[in-house]
Amino acid sequence: MRVLSVLLVALTVAGSAYSQCTVNDASSAQLDSTFGPTTGGDALTFNNNLGNQIQIANNYNFVSNGVVQSNGGDNLVLTGTLTPANSSLTDKFSLRAAFVRTTTPSDVKRELQAGAYTSNGGTVDPSTWSFYQILPDNTKMVSLTNPNTVVTMSENPNTALQVGVGANGKNLQNGASGWFQFKATDGSVSIQSGNGEMEVVDININLGCSSTFDCVSNTYTISKASIDKSLTDQQNDQALYVDQVSTVFGNQQRFDTSSGTVNTISIDQTNGNLRLGAGFTSISDSSITVNCDLRFSPALPSANYQPKLELMNSAYVSGGGSIDPNTWAYYTVNVSGSSCTRNDGTVVTITGDQDNMYLQWGKGANGKNGNFGLSVWLNYVDAALTNPFFDINVDTVCETNPSTNLPETSPPTEQPTAPPATCPPGCIPAIPVVNVTETPAAGNSASSIEMSKLVVAILSLFILAFFH
């Protein structure tokens, strides 16, 4: 069975005739029969059989999809649900590992056969790789069945997570790998890795465009997330819900997406920012409408962050279901660039994420069904109420022919194209970086793919000119 995680990487596209995908699947880095080493093939490995000392497996792969979210490459956050590989043990783990971009370490790992590298006539050039330092305070593995079983990770001296073609150390594909010291405990017994290279936790993954998050247009149509009775006991569904009766929302609490308006979310490839533009109509009084233009930046949740889980426990991987919250992407609101406006001109002033809960996006993230969607909880200003907020629950579908016409709103004081200089708690500063090299298909080199895309672009321009 092909095991996957997802790498969400918003890439800067500079001087290129094409746009790379903003999301990548990450699968276990399988051994290349010609250029690979003699051992490996799993996504995460405790070397020297250290895992068995506290009754956990030594080798793990992802159950379904995880997410590494980035604002353009400065920070990466790898999340996923791990299951033992080739072991009688069944204990699954929730993984969150955070990284920050760093300089080239003194110990760049070259695990492939010598002939794989450009210095010996091969195709793998380590000078093109990017490197990331682990953030221990935001990195943790926790057992889904025994929360007392916890693994923390820290930097292994002179090394870093390396990302690029051949960087996974197992094959010639685009990927990532890293070696980290760790401390593991099951609540009563603790083990800690030594400084030796044989006593580390090892991550080895392939990277490739995601069939789930990758939308060529970077634009998604949104609609009300209808309740799936097999997954939730909730009774009411709506696209927008106001928690208290508020004059700001015309004393209406339940809204559906408006017909006749463009209701979309769009992704900025240069920094990973998300923009939600939609119209909402009161379900009980169709004369009252609200148009919203909301801006978000990728968030960096802590290792202990708990997403909002509104479905039955049995719907989630931890309860035996198929929905994995570790596959979701998270965003924090940019209040200076966000606003909602009622059709009578009343402006809804957004003040932040309600109770520090981030916008969550992915399969089942809307809290109403198992579809690909999102939910978000936002505080707003109403002097007559205490801690007022509204939440949005919608399905999202890739738009093949997106429109750029968003619902009209009162323009905010500032229209930023990137997060503010001082981000809200959890916000990642937007720092565009050089593109990660795209994975070549089997039998093709990265350079041949680039040449093919350039040829296609030139032919397209020729055809347009000829028929003009």
From Swiss-Prot:
Residues 445-468 form a propeptide. One of its GO terms (cellular component) is plasma membrane. It comes from the Eukaryota. This is Uncharacterized protein DDB_G0291392. A lipid is attached at residue 444 (GPI-like-anchor amidated asparagine). Glycans are attached at residues 86, 334, 435. The keyword Lyase does not apply. It comes from Dictyostelium discoideum. Residues 1-19 form the signal peptide. Keywords: Cell membrane, Glycoprotein, GPI-anchor, Lipoprotein, Membrane, Signal. The keyword Glycoprotein applies. It is found in: Cell membrane. It is a lipid-anchor; GPI-anchor. The lineage of its organism: Eukaryota, Amoebozoa, Evosea, Eumycetozoa, Dictyostelia. Residues 409-421 have a biased composition (Pro residues). Induction: Down-regulated in grlA null cells at 16 hours of starvation. Residues 401-421 are annotated as: Disordered.
